[in-house]
Structures are given as structure tokens and as C-alpha cells.
Amino acid sequence: MSFLKTTTVVVTLTAGLLLSTVAQAHPKLLSSTPAEGSDAAAPSKIELHFSENLTTQFSGAKLIMTDMPGMPNSPMGVKAGVSGGGDPKTMVITPTSPLTTGTYKVEWRAVSSDTHPITGNFSFKVK
């Protein structure tokens, strides 16, 4: 094979690998406030920071109280609004009422430009 043909094959294969990697990229949760597993005062909002810009109309989250002192019932949903943050890589959950002492779980769904939904969850405690 000539040098030119070999170079063309190598460049084509490299470009194909790079494009397939970009096409398969999905948003990843990089951090949250409060952080996963944290034990802190009640936050007025919960921020989720992702690795990619989110498509807000297809992304969302639920806030669930999973445990509290004297809680005899099953986990219960907490009313909260979900919106994009000032940064397109941020999702903000704002409870409609102050959070009380207990354990909370955030279940999130993130969709970026590749349109594949990625889901996850994390928990934190409120003192």
C-alpha cells in the first residue's frame, strides 16, 4: 500500500472513531448541592450539575422523602418545581415548602442533544 493510501486509511479510521465517541456521549452528573450522602441544613433549592448542556423540555427530576423521625408511611413525593439553571448544564429543583428533618432522594432524568435519556438518583439528609 502506498504512503498516501495508508495515510488516508488511518485518517478515515481515526475520524470515524472520534465521531462515534462524540455521538455516543451522554450527560453525566458531575456534582450536586447538597452533595450525595451529605447531612446538612434544609436547602432552599437542589442543584444538579451535568457534563453536557441539557434539553430542558425532556429532562426532569422528582424529590422524594424516604425517611423522617416517626414516619410510619411509605416514601412520599415532595412538591417541587424543576427548572434549568443559569448554566445550560444545571438543573434546579425548588421545593414549594421548606424541607423538614429527614432523608430525601432525588431521582433525575437528563437528556442532552443526543436525545438519549440518562437516569440516576442520590440521597441526602436534612438535620
Residue ranges and their predicted role:
Residues Q24-K62:
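N-terminal non-catalytic regions of secreted/periplasmic and cell-surface proteins
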Residues S38, E52-F124:
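Acidic, low-complexity Ser/Thr/Gly/Pro-rich repeat segments typical of extracellular/periplasmic
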Residues M1-V11:
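Bacterial N-terminal signal peptides that target proteins for export
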